[in-house]
Amino acid sequence: MLVNLTRRNLLKGSAAVGGFVFGVQSGSVGLMNSVAEAATGSFDAGLYVTINNDGSTVITCARSEMGQGVRTSLPMIVADELEADWSRCSVVQADGDQKWVDAGQELDTDGSRSVRRDIKRLRTAGAAARMMLEQAGAKKWNVPVSEITSQNHTVTHTKSGRSADYGELVGIASGLSVPAESDVQVKDRSEWKYINNESAFTPDKYVDLMDMTTGKGIYGADVILP
């Protein structure tokens, strides 16, 4: 569920931030609205997706990797709806703060339910970000947003053929309002590139695969208490 998004502003890009930031709070898609907080890493809610001015995209995973591939599957859900180029995405791990989950929930990873539990809000988050980038493209070229498409980290005006990388649009997108939940348009299943697509999980796309298969990965079981 999106909470009060129509009254929130997208985090404004600045030299300190270099892009815009999406967040998750209380199990809902939200946005950070303080540049000062962004610069210091102190947020009311967890950092979720960052798109930088160079187009590089950082997705935060709030579930724990235990060899099941959750650090690939969950960020790929966001990337799919965002129409992001996976090769330009990186994944960082969330901390253990309760801000990542609804009140009364545990920030745990168990029962093979991470995707089932999070897929709806992750899809919504990615789709909302994509729509804002499309709106930014429409504003940049002064054309109707209905003439704008997005694919593979690029926004295109179909009639003129003009295009812009996501990184070129973060400044404009930072001044736009977040779409209401009822207006967020997620992809049809037939349009999925990563979700439910086994071919997307090739070794080169799998986060941490080399570390997991060579024994370099660090897990909770590796912790030795003094």
Task: Label each residue range with its predicted role.
Residues 2-23, 32-226:
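Cofactor-binding beta-sheet edge motifs in enzyme active sites
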